[in-house]
């Protein structure tokens, strides 16, 4: 009997335990739901507020980030509820703070650089912070209100925890495992949701699955946090790095861009008849013989045959693309500067509005004489190495989630370990011309001391080889004064410069701007009141470029080489340090998002009596093929992603880093998918116009992907080897050179990592010493 009672008691206890567990699970699910909603609200708030700070508005395409908020919120819910009330009371604000700090970092980075921080740039974080700390301080002070708003969820959470008796329940371990599966499930549900909405090139799904998408474009569609997750997956785990349709090279020809009118367009034909013409008068037709120009093609490259003879899929796709690519053609300006000298300048932060008739008259003269590219656009918003790479190689730099990281981040530094026979300097070396490269900062930065010689700039000098009054930024004039004697006595020369004086921020903290400020104010005279301090400081920084150009022209004239020397100069990127108010003040008008890319590329030669205007749309990658044509230097234009601006039988487009583009028919903004047409669209059906945009998007994607493949697969070496242009000895020598370059690069990475470590330790030691001293003083008192 007692045994039966004991069994019944045990059964009752089990039932109570089950009931208790069931209640705990139900309570836990309720707590999990609350934490989930809190994190979802925090992430949504931060995304919307950051988007407003970036673009000033939210449009439909920006809302795709909501597809991933459930997964992101569930991920953070995994770490909530681990403890009992007090522990969770501490954990929750910490988790919210982590989210808030992430968005604060993105906001500050955007305020400095004009774009969002990518995963591939993380390896450069320490170096960037070190070099830009003096700029960061001002941005942090100016952003204090916005940063406080970003931190508002954390502040509110802490406040409620202190003044309200709110319970912070935990939940069983089972409910910490469940959110892991829910996070994965919700993430894939978000992907499928985007897929249902649309998969074309303008869709969020395309941006998600296309690993060549840049950070800003991805964040514009998917949100900042989802972009970080997607980029981390691609970078650290290779997620999506395989072949897929969204990143396939597409062959698009000129025929695909023929806009056919939906309805016939009547043409008015005017006939002129002489009243007294007799019946016997012979009608004479004036026949204008059209000159047929040859394409810029190297007959040694048979890309169609190479495609047929390879079994490698990536190589076959590249060869097919190159075989079908429209070449540039020789034209009336071919050889205009044959035999001349070339000075090729990539100028830091240089923009059209740096050319001011009163402040920088030499720059203004050079801008409006020589060859004037009226529709030149600088493709890049920031990051010097990207604009520099495109300007010197006519390849697009990798700004995608494929991009490698490290201090040597970017295609230009990575090109040091690749075979680069089509760098600008290489062409002049092949023609027996001495080549030089000069930069007024350290050659280790962006690994220029490795990459420049590899694209043909054989004799390079950097900071250390030259002496400067200031380190950051240093003087362009001082660089010019120390460099010209190296080459000026040569019969022929090609000199490349990467300047530095124009670097921001454009405040009194800038050494170059500060030393030129009084001079610029005096030169502006009565117009001074029209400019705010930021605009004046920008002109003051560019005044150093003015001084360096004055010196350059004077020395060339003294040497009797001014008339047969071509000076090419453009900016590395838009001067992103300019705020909207500074930009408006400098331009004396408001500038649209696309207009800020409209810039100047000088092709100046004092020997030209009259300026030559070219109204074709063009950008950074188009300059190398244009120069090669002007100098009549043989090349295969299919291997360059730019087009000679004077090639009359070619399509001309200014493409931006985010795949926006402009030409004589349309301006397409990829950030909002808006197309502003310059033609009468009423005679075309909507389908034809839409097809035109999508074909251009496909072509631009292909140019970009082909450029990435050139670096990723070292494809120039593959082409030269399979075309029989290199001997076994030359191949072995190149492999040895590339391996040594990468060894040096790795050694430099270790040196800089060690320097960062020592710097950090020194800072921690100094802080500890200061704290100990303060404590000691407190005891003494």
Per-region residue spans from a language model:
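Catalytic cores of glycan-processing enzymes that make or break glycosidic bonds
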Residues: 141, 244, 338
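Hydrophobic alpha-helical transmembrane segments of multipass integral membrane proteins
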Residues: 97-104, 151, 681, 688-692
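Long, solvent-exposed N-terminal ectodomains of secreted or membrane-tethered precursors processed
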Residues: 43, 47, 88, 92, ...
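Membrane-interface segments at or immediately adjacent to transmembrane helices
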Residues: 189-330
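Extended, compositionally biased non-globular segments that define protein topology
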Residues: 1-148, 155-195
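Alpha-helical scaffold segments in carbohydrate-active enzymes
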Residues: 100, 202, 206, 573-576
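Low-complexity, acidic Ser/Thr/Pro-rich repeat tracts that form intrinsically disordered stalk/linker regions
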Residues: 6-13, 266-285, 763-781
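Solvent-exposed soluble domains appended to multi-pass membrane proteins
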Residues: 310-781
